[in-house]
Design a protein with these regions (language model features):
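Surface-exposed polar/charged interaction patches
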Residues: 35, 74-81, 97, 104, ...
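Amphipathic, well-ordered alpha-helical segments in soluble domains
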Residues: 32-35, 39, 67, 97, ...
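Long, charged amphipathic alpha-helices with heptad-repeat/coiled-coil character
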Residues: 36-54, 102-141
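Extended alpha-helical coiled-coil "stalk/arm" regions
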Residues: 46-95
Length: 144
C-alpha cells in the first residue's frame, strides 16, 4: 500500500460574515459528502469485482493457451482424416476462446484494476477535502 500526501486547500472562511451562509455551505457540503460516499461504495464494489475477475480471466487464459499448445502438438502427429479434422476444429474454437479472453483481459485485467484503484483513491481524497472544508466552515461558524 502506498500512502499519498495531498494538499488540503486553505479556505477563505474569514470572508463569511453570517451564520446563515455557513449553514448553506454546510448543507451543500453534506450533500457532496453523501454523493461521494455513495460513489466510493460503488467504486469499491467495482474494484473488488475487477480484482476477482482479473485473476479469474488470467487463469482461464493460461489454461486455454496450455490446451492450445497440447492440441497443436496433437494435430502435428495425426494423419489426415476425421480425427485430425476434429482436432483442427477444436483448435479453431480454442483460438476464438483465447481471443475473447484476451479482450476480457484488456477490460478486466491488471491495468483496468489499477485504474479502478486510482478512481477509489481519488474519491477518498475528495471526501477528505470535503471534511476539511466542513471543519473550516464549522470553525468559522463557531467564531461568529
Amino acid at each position: 500500500n502506498i500512502t499519498l500526501n495531498f494538499y488540503i486547500m486553505n479556505y477563505t472562511v474569514q470572508n463569511l460574515t453570517q451564520v446563515a451562509d455557513c449553514d448553506v455551505l454546510l448543507s451543500w457540503a453534506q450533500k457532496e459528502k453523501a454523493d461521494l460516499t455513495f460513489r466510493k461504495l460503488s467504486v469499491e464494489r467495482l474494484t473488488d469485482r475487477y480484482a476477482e475477475t482479473s485473476v479469474e480471466v488470467a487463469t482461464q487464459l493460461q489454461g486455454v493457451i496450455a490446451e492450445l499448445a497440447a492440441v497443436d502438438s496433437y494435430i502435428a502427429i495425426l494423419p489426415d482424416g476425421p480425427i485430425k479434422d476434429e482436432a483442427v476444429d477444436k483448435k479453431t474454437r480454442l483460438e476464438y476462446k483465447k481471443f475473447l479472453l484476451e479482450g476480457r483481459v484488456e477490460s478486466y485485467g491488471v491495468v483496468a484494476l489499477l485504474e479502478k484503484q486510482m478512481d477509489l483513491g481519488r474519491v477518498e481524497q475528495e471526501i477528505a477535502e470535503v471534511d476539511a472544508f466542513v471543519a473550516a466552515v464549522e470553525a468559522r461558524k463557531a467564531a461568529l
